[in-house]
Regions:
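Condensing-enzyme catalytic core mediating Claisen C-C bond formation in acyl metabolism
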Residues: 1-50, 149-205, 209, 316-389
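Conserved beta-ketoacyl condensing-enzyme motif
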Residues: 7, 53-113, 223-249
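Acidic, glycine-rich active-site loops and adjacent beta-strand->loop/helix elements
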Residues: 11-13, 79-84, 111-116, 139-144, ...
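Short, well-ordered amphipathic alpha-helical segments that serve as non-catalytic structural scaffolds
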Residues: 31, 53-68, 90, 206-222, ...
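Conserved catalytic cysteine-centered active-site region
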Residues: 34-38, 42-54, 82-134, 251-282
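Flexible, glycine-rich active-site loops centered on histidine and acidic residues
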Residues: 128-161
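A conserved active-site cap/scaffold subdomain adjacent to cofactor or substrate pockets
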Residues: 201-222, 227-246, 250, 271-276
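Catalytic phosphate/nucleotide-handling subdomain of diverse soluble enzymes
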Residues: 288-337
């Protein structure tokens, strides 16, 4: 008998600062509605130098790992575009910070915004073969395009942590999925750069084309059609992108279903609208947002479109489980988002420039205002100094 495998728990972390998108629009000489409606973003996470992908991942993972679970994690698969080292995996730093058992396998997975999906599917296959195993999958990034660039409004950052197990509480993954790879230069980041290079309009077109391709292939493989779905969850670099994706397939549904799919989309974009782009974590923040704000019942089939520039697309699906509400702490997430401090555009620009420099100097970061459990205190002897409070 095949074991049912999928997402048992989800944790999420984003730093304690945000920038208001209407304020940014005004500062950049744009109509605020371009950002609020045209792009579909209201707030953007601002990442202080004291947070990086490792600390954000630790802050997300610590929400879902009890001491007993920490001892049981067989593997850590860390999806990220914002790696902090060209050799050593962020998963190794993370495993140490969290106090995981040394009997764990810890690696980093890279393919732009697709890394966490690769991690999730590899984890699911591993658990199908080893049903007792628990795998920690991370999607953590700092989405960084540059001050006064077209991509600036689509920045953000944070981490999603998922525990993949047999008989999961939140979602069982269907075994079938459809994926597609093409060598496309829509978004990339050479190792000498801290900001992505992007052909913005082209990237949005490739996203939509890839969605069309994998959705058609998935339907062919499964004989399922849109009527078999209760909601679609999209990679959301900005919320308008997923809205365009959904619009592409809505005509395949009857009017009643169109209404419910649109309502589910509104729920799925709510939290992303207030955090911004997490690159590889965005799809899974959108899932969390749907679970928090949507009206789904157990047994619902959800469709997922994952996209990572460069480019890789995947469509996969899963079934919502009866106790899905127990798999995440919705109240903690509401508090995390509500307690963030708004920074002005000038403060955001200062913080943007204050990131840990790309050189070998020793640095002590201003950690006095840091409220997160895990943070970065600086760099000594070319080693990042991670701390827990
Ligand atoms: N009121 C309402 N809407 C307005 C408006 C106003 N006053 N002014 C403009 N708009 C609308 C425009 O009509 C447009 O809507 P449509 O796309 O529906 O036509 C929207 O606002 C955006 O306007 P522009 O196209 O003029 O915006 P832009 O040229 O400044 O750039 C962008 C938009 C290309 C997305 C840019 O922000 C960018 O390059 N972002 C980074 C790349 C990106 O996120 N790509 C997504 C796919 S790649 C991916 O998914 C991987 C990843 O995470 C990086």
């Amino acid at each position: 008998m095949t074991v049912s495998v999928g997402i048992d728990k989800i944790g999420f972390y984003t730093p304690s600062l945000y920038l208001d998108m209407a304020e940014l629009a005004t500062a950049r000489g744009e109509d605020p509605n371009k950002y609020l409606i045209g792009i579909g973003q209201s707030k953007q996470a601002v990442i202080p130098p004291t947070q990086d992908i490792v600390t954000m991942a630790a802050n997300a993972a610590s929400q879902i790992l009890t001491p007993a679970l920490k001892a049981e994690v067989a593997m850590v698969l860390f999806g990220t575009e914002s790696g902090i080292d060209n050799s050593k995996a962020s998963a190794v730093y993370l495993a140490h910070l969290l106090g995981l058992s040394p009997k764990t396998r810890a690696i980093e997975v890279k393919q732009a915004c697709y890394g966490a999906t690769a991690g999730l599917q590899l984890a699911a296959d591993y658990v199908r073969v080893h049903p007792q195993a628990k795998v920690l999958v991370i999607g953590a990034d700092v989405a960084r395009y540059g001050l006064r660039t077209a991509g600036e409004v689509t920045q953000g950052g944070g981490a999603v942590a998922m525990l993949v197990t047999a008989d999961p509480q939140i979602l069982t993954l269907d075994m079938v999925s459809s994926y597609h790879t093409e060598d496309v230069m829509d978004f990339w980041r050479p190792t000498y750069r801290t900001e992505a290079l992007v052909d913005g309009k082209y990237s949005t077109n490739v996203y939509l084309d890839f969605f069309k391709t994998v959705w058609a292939d998935y339907q062919q493989q499964t004989n399922r059609t849109i009527v078999d779905f209760d909601a679609f969850v999209f990679h959301l670099p900005f919320t308008k992108m997923g809205r365009k994706g959904l619009r592409q397939i809505l005509p395949e549904a009857q009017p009643d279903q169109q209404k419910s799919l649109k309502a589910a989309f509104e729920a799925s974009q709510e939290d992303n609208r207030n955090v911004g782009n997490l690159y590889t974590g965005s799809l899974y923040l959108s899932l969390l947002s749907l679970l928090r704000h949507g009206q789904l019942t157990a047994g619902a089939r959800l469709g997922f479109f994952s996209y990572g520039s460069g480019a890789e697309g995947e469509f996969f699906s899963g079934i919502l489980q009866p106790n899905y509400q127990r798999g995440f702490d919705g109240a903690a997430l509401t508090t995390l988002l509500a307690q963030r401090k708004r920074v002005s555009v000038a403060e955001y620009e200062d913080i943007y420039r204050a990131q840990l420099s790309n050189d070998s100097r020793d640095v002590q970061l201003p950690v006095g205002e840091e409220v997160a459990q895990y943070y970065l205190a600086g760099r000594q002897n070319q080693q990042r100094q991670y701390r827990e409070q």
